[in-house]
């Protein structure tokens, strides 16, 4: 009897162990979960794009200012990959508000020619694949949002006007503002793969199922090129994972956009190695699952920034300042200044210690005076753009942070990041100029009063 129970206990133990082992193996191997690109967009996307914030507390607010009476310009000059422009305006149903938006239903209608005061529906501008949205849930302001695709075949320009010039406080007038949007034609090649039955007239020379060999297709991309996959059901890590047969890898912060039936991959400006890949699976049905592998080109671009390490083997930095050469309790300043009307740059820091703050997502605003500490803010809000790509790397004992900007920035900006190693601190002070918008704003200051006199 004891022998039987002893064997029974052994048998039960073996059974439970085997059952647990099978569950672990099954869960680790598991099947891919497939979702629509739109579902994945809801799970992964925040706000990507640009803001013109004319609300009372906004960066472009038009409240009366005795010191600063100039008109305000909010300019956007960029290509778009389903990025958004968010126009934030005071509630217009407030009887005390003198704020006017022209045209009233901007962005549904816009000015195509500010000099001719030509008001047209947005569909007549030539935009391809865009969406409009309004959000009135906030009690203090409303939001007008336009989301723009990369498929325009020409540069497109349009305007809206925000007017708060009536006398709102005694004899002091409020201010006016120009919203100036230039949607650039996407500057790089767009490669498309259509695995749906739908025709998209703006996807030219698209690959299809016949181009796959054994359900697999690999496509090489040059820097900045887009790959647009049209598919109804994609795996839930689409383009976020590597081709497992290769050692290279890409970064989680690459530009990957999910929109309607599209999964879009932008070849990054910074690639870690020459065998980096990313893949996406498209499920037609249980028997037909296609794997698309993208392989970005590898190019060693110069990094505008500061290498505080003695190691010069990782890429080329414009400034090299080895912290180990300095005495303790020393602060080292590394200054980097760039001024271009159009950017295609990598900006970065290499640090053998700790990078402070969480650069480049977070950065220090420049010091306003010696008695006040720098404030921490977000890089996209400091530059007032949303089209930024962030990269991280480790090389030996050095932590490397990099970001890239492509296009123009609305206004010049400065910020600081720190590299702290024991009792030595390196300060990277970055200044990014905006030559184009400095010239444009001067024209606007002269022109906008004439415009309102003419209205």
From Swiss-Prot:
<keyword id="KW-0336">GPI-anchor</keyword>
<comment type="function">
    <text>Gametocyte surface protein required for male fertility.</text>
</comment>
<keyword id="KW-0461">Malaria</keyword>
<dbReference type="InterPro" id="IPR010884">
    <property type="entry name" value="6_CYS_dom"/>
</dbReference>
<keyword id="KW-0677">Repeat</keyword>
<comment type="subunit">
    <text>Heterodimer; heterodimerizes with PF230.</text>
</comment>
<keyword id="KW-0449">Lipoprotein</keyword>
<feature type="disulfide bond">
    <location>
        <begin position="52"/>
        <end position="74"/>
    </location>
</feature>
<feature type="propeptide" description="Removed in mature form">
    <location>
        <begin position="434"/>
        <end position="455"/>
    </location>
</feature>
<keyword id="KW-0472">Membrane</keyword>
<feature type="disulfide bond">
    <location>
        <begin position="359"/>
        <end position="417"/>
    </location>
</feature>
<dbReference type="InterPro" id="IPR038160">
    <property type="entry name" value="6_CYS_dom_sf"/>
</dbReference>
<keyword id="KW-0325">Glycoprotein</keyword>
<dbReference type="Pfam" id="PF07422">
    <property type="entry name" value="s48_45"/>
</dbReference>
<dbReference type="GO" id="GO:0005886">
    <property type="term" value="C:plasma membrane"/>
</dbReference>
<feature type="glycosylation site" description="N-linked (GlcNAc...) asparagine">
    <location>
        <position position="275"/>
    </location>
</feature>
<feature type="glycosylation site" description="N-linked (GlcNAc...) asparagine">
    <location>
        <position position="307"/>
    </location>
</feature>
<protein>
    <recommendedName>
        <fullName>Gametocyte surface protein P45/48</fullName>
    </recommendedName>
</protein>
<feature type="domain" description="6-Cys 1">
    <location>
        <begin position="48"/>
        <end position="186"/>
    </location>
</feature>
<keyword id="KW-0732">Signal</keyword>
<feature type="signal peptide">
    <location>
        <begin position="1"/>
        <end position="30"/>
    </location>
</feature>
<feature type="disulfide bond">
    <location>
        <begin position="106"/>
        <end position="160"/>
    </location>
</feature>
<keyword id="KW-1015">Disulfide bond</keyword>
<feature type="glycosylation site" description="N-linked (GlcNAc...) asparagine">
    <location>
        <position position="135"/>
    </location>
</feature>
<feature type="disulfide bond">
    <location>
        <begin position="306"/>
        <end position="334"/>
    </location>
</feature>
<dbReference type="GO" id="GO:0098552">
    <property type="term" value="C:side of membrane"/>
</dbReference>
<feature type="lipid moiety-binding region" description="GPI-anchor amidated glycine">
    <location>
        <position position="433"/>
    </location>
</feature>
<keyword id="KW-1003">Cell membrane</keyword>
<feature type="domain" description="6-Cys 2">
    <location>
        <begin position="302"/>
        <end position="433"/>
    </location>
</feature>
<dbReference type="GO" id="GO:0009986">
    <property type="term" value="C:cell surface"/>
</dbReference>
<feature type="glycosylation site" description="N-linked (GlcNAc...) asparagine">
    <location>
        <position position="194"/>
    </location>
</feature>
<feature type="disulfide bond">
    <location>
        <begin position="351"/>
        <end position="419"/>
    </location>
</feature>
